[in-house]
Amino acid sequence: MARSHPLEKYRNIGIMAHIDAGKTTTTERILYYTGKSYKIGEVHEGTATMDWMEQEQERGITITSAATTCFWNDHRINIIDTPGHVDFTIEVERSLRVLDGAVTAFDGVAGVEPQSETVWRQADKYRVPRMCYVNKLDRTGANFQRCVQMIKDRLGARPAVLYLPIGIESSFVGLVDLVENRAIVWLEESLGAKFEYRDIPDDMKDEAAVARQELIELAVEQDEAAMESYLEGNEPDVATLKALLRKGTLAFDFVPVLCGSSFKNKGVQPLLDAVVDYLPSPLDIPDVQGVKLDGETPDSRPAEDSAPMSALAFKIMNDPFVGSLTFARIYSGKLEKGTYLNSVKDKKEKIGRMLLMHANSREDIEEAYAGDIVALAGLKETTTGDTLCAPSAPIILERMEFPDPVIELSVEPKTKADQEKMGIALNRLAAEDPSFRVSSDHESGQTIIKGMGELHLEILVDRMKREFKVEANVGAPQVAYREYLKKPVELVYTHKKQSGGSGQFGEVKVQVKPGERGSGFVFVDEVKGGNIPREYIPSVEKGMRETAEGGSLIGFPIVDVEVHLIDGKYHDVDSSALAFEITGRGAMREAAQKAGITILEPIMKVEVVTPEDYLGDVIGDMNSRRGQIQGTDSRGNAQVVEAMVPLANMFGYVNQLRSFTQGRAQYSMQFSHYDEVPANVADEVKAKLA
C-alpha cells in the first residue's frame, strides 16, 4: 500500500491555549467538519471526543495529549491535543517536541492569559511556527482588537490579521476574509457546516480596506520583487499574497491571526484552510537532529521515505481496549507491521499492532511513513522520549530531558484488597510518565511516590482511584534529603556470635571516605593473601551498600561513599556469606558514626518569567526563600529571573506567585544538584524527622 498523501500535504499541528480558551471545543469542531466525528461533543457536558480520561471530562481540563488524524482539502492533518495546566507543562513540551506547527487559541474576552504566555514561550524554545485563533467572539465582553493588541504587547509578536469579525457578542454572524476580500456568513441551521460568500457589508468596507492594506504591506516585506511591484502600484494577487504570508509565518516574522466562535460553529473552516495554507509540512522544517550511539557524534535524518527509519516515542498511555499504547512520531523512513526495530536501549522491539488514532476510536494499519503519528501496541522496552530506529542505522534523536522527581509522599492502601491493585496501578502510571517514580521505604514498609510537583502527585493519586479503583491514604509532601560523610575514617569491625554448634564470625578492616559528588557507592577490594576468601567479598560489599542506602542519621541514603576493604580475618567453621554480610553492615554503621554526617538537600533551578512591574517583588521573594539569584534577562517584553533555591522553600510557591503577580508570572523549576544544608536548617530537619 503506497503513501496516501505526499509529504508536502501533511500538517502535524497542536492546539495550545490557556485552560478556558476553548481548545477542546475547537478540536471537536475540526473533527466534525472534517467528517471524523458525527456528534458534536461539548466540554461542559463532559462528552468531548479528545478529553477521553474520566478525570478530564469531569474537571473540564485536558491532561493527556491524544493524537488524531483528519483530512481537509486533500491534506492530512494530525492534531495533538495539549494540556493547558501549568503542572502539565512537561506534557506540553513533549507534544511541542513532535509538532511542526501550532495554533494558539485565545479567549476573545480574556485575551492573552498567563498560561498562554507560558506555552508561547515553550513554543519559542522549540522553534514551532504558529498562528493565533481568537475564539469565543460571541461572548459578552469579547473584543477582537484588544486581543490583537495583547498579542503584540504581552507576547512580543507581530500579528498579521487575516480576518475581521462581522458583528460582535450576540450579533456575531461571520467574518471578512482580508486575503480573498469577501465576507463569509454561516447558516445557523446547518450547525455551521454550510456558509455563503457575500460582499463585504457597507459599514465595514473602509475598515476592511485599511486592514487589507496593512496585511499586504506586511506580506510584501518577504520578497524584494513583490515589494517593488507593490510600490509601483500593483497589488499582489491572492496566490502570491498567500505564498508571501506562508513564507513570513515559517520565518517567524509574523503570526497570522484568525477569529471565530467554535462553540457557535463559526470560523472553524477558515482556520482549517489557514492550517493548510500557512503552517509547515514536515518538509518545511529542518531535518531532525540526533547523535550516533556513542552519544556524542552528531547525526540527522531527512523527512524522506527512502531514509533509514527513525521515530520518537512521545507518549505512553493505557487504552482500556488495546492495553499499553506508545504514540510515536515518524521522522524518516517507513515503518511496517511485524518488523523489528532498535530502541535506544539497544534492545529489539517487534512492531505488533499499528493504529491510527482518532480521539478514542482506532483504525488498524499495516504501514506508516515519514511524517505520520501512530500508536504502537505491545512495545516492551520503549519508554517516553526513546528513539525507535532501523537496526542497520541507529540514531538517538535528541532525548527529551525528564528531570528527577523532587517531591515525595507516602501512600497506603486502605484495605488488603487495595494493596495488590495499588502495586499494579503505580507501575502502570510510572510507565506512562517518566517524571513519576515509585519506591518503598525499607524501615516503615511504606510505599513512596515521587513526582514533579504537588498537583502532579494529586492527579496521579486521583487517577489511581478512578482508573484502578484503589482507595489510598496519602501523607504530606516531603523533601528527598541525602546524607554525606564529613571525613575519612579507618576501622576494624568484628562480628562474633556463638550459641552452641556453629556460630558466626567475620572481621574486616576498612577505610571509608566521602567520594566525589555524584560518584555513587564505590567499593575497592584490596585484600591480599586470602585473608578473606574471595566468595565472601561480595557479601561484605552488599552489607555495606545496603546499610548506606538505608541511611544513618535521619534515615535518608548516604550518597557518594568510597570504601576500601583492606584486610580481614575468617574462621573455617563459623564464617559464611551471611556472617560477612552482617559484618559489612556493622562496619558501615560504625564508619558513619565515626565520620559524622552532613545533610544534603535538593537545590532547584527556578526560572520565573514575569512582567517588568513585578520584577522587584519576585527577586525579594526569592531571597527570602534562601534563593541565590543567578541573573535576570529579558525575553520578548517579559523579564526572566533565574535562581537556585532549596526545594524545601518552594512548597506552595505557585499560589504565592499567582497572588502577588495577579497570575501574570509563571515559573518552571527543575532539579539542579544536591548541596549541604546550613547548620541552623540541619537542626530543624533533624528535629522534624527525629
UniProtKB/Swiss-Prot annotation:
Ranges annotated as spanning the membrane: none
Domain tr-type G: start-end pairs: 8-283
Main location: cytoplasm
Compartments in which it is found: Cytoplasm
InterPro entries: EF-G-like_DII, EFG_II, EFG_III, EFG_III/V, EFG_IV, EFG_V, EFG_V-like, G_TR_CS
Gene Ontology terms: biological process: ribosome disassembly
SUPFAM superfamilies for the chain: EF-G C-terminal domain-like, P-loop containing nucleoside triphosphate hydrolases, Ribosomal protein S5 domain 2-like, Translation proteins
Cystine bridges: none
GO cellular component: cytoplasm
Keyword Ribosomal protein: no
Residues annotated to bind GTP: 17-24, 81-85, 135-138
Keyword Cytoplasm among UniProt keywords: yes
Origin: domain of life: Bacteria
Pfam families: EF-G_D2, EFG_C, EFG_III, EFG_IV, GTP_EFTU
Gene Ontology molecular function: GTP binding; GTPase activity; translation elongation factor activity
Keywords: Cytoplasm, Elongation factor, GTP-binding, Nucleotide-binding, Protein biosynthesis
Function: Catalyzes the GTP-dependent ribosomal translocation step during translation elongation. During this step, the ribosome changes from the pre-translocational (PRE) to the post-translocational (POST) state as the newly formed A-site-bound peptidyl-tRNA and P-site-bound deacylated tRNA move to the P and E sites, respectively. Catalyzes the coordinated movement of the two tRNA molecules, the mRNA and conformational changes in the ribosome.
Family the entry assigns: Belongs to the TRAFAC class translation factor GTPase superfamily. Classic translation factor GTPase family. EF-G/EF-2 subfamily.
Protein name: Elongation factor G
Species of the source: Rhizorhabdus wittichii (strain DSM 6014 / CCUG 31198 / JCM 15750 / NBRC 105917 / EY 4224 / RW1)
Gene name of this polypeptide: fusA
